[in-house]
Amino acid sequence: MKNIGRKSNMTDKQIKFFKELEIIQEQAVSMNISQSNLTKEELLFNVSYDTVVLMMELLDGYRNMVLELSDKESREILNKDIQLHDGVVDFLKSF
């Protein structure tokens, strides 16, 4: 675990993945920064909601990578035959 955060010890794909997460974080904040009419709690729900949706889009292949999300124990691929970014809207709160 001591390699975490050291780009020199990461593969190109790992760096690309973390760069996508960096972009997602920036986008989620930018999408919500001007919502001054919301309470702090509502704003936090929105930022976290948008972050998760954007991450699900990454897993769904709508960004610069094609990834699989799998359960290690059963090896079930969780993003097979489903759009995670569509499914998440039924579970998370947004204002």
What positions do the PLM features span?
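N-terminal low-complexity, intrinsically disordered segments
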Residues: M1-L38, L69-E73, S94
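Generic detection of intrinsically disordered/low-complexity segments and helix-coil linkers/edges
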Residues: T11-D12, L43, H85
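Long, hydrophobic, amphipathic alpha-helical segments used as structural scaffolds
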Residues: N32, T51-V66
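Mature extracytoplasmic domains of secretory-pathway proteins
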Residues: Q35-L54
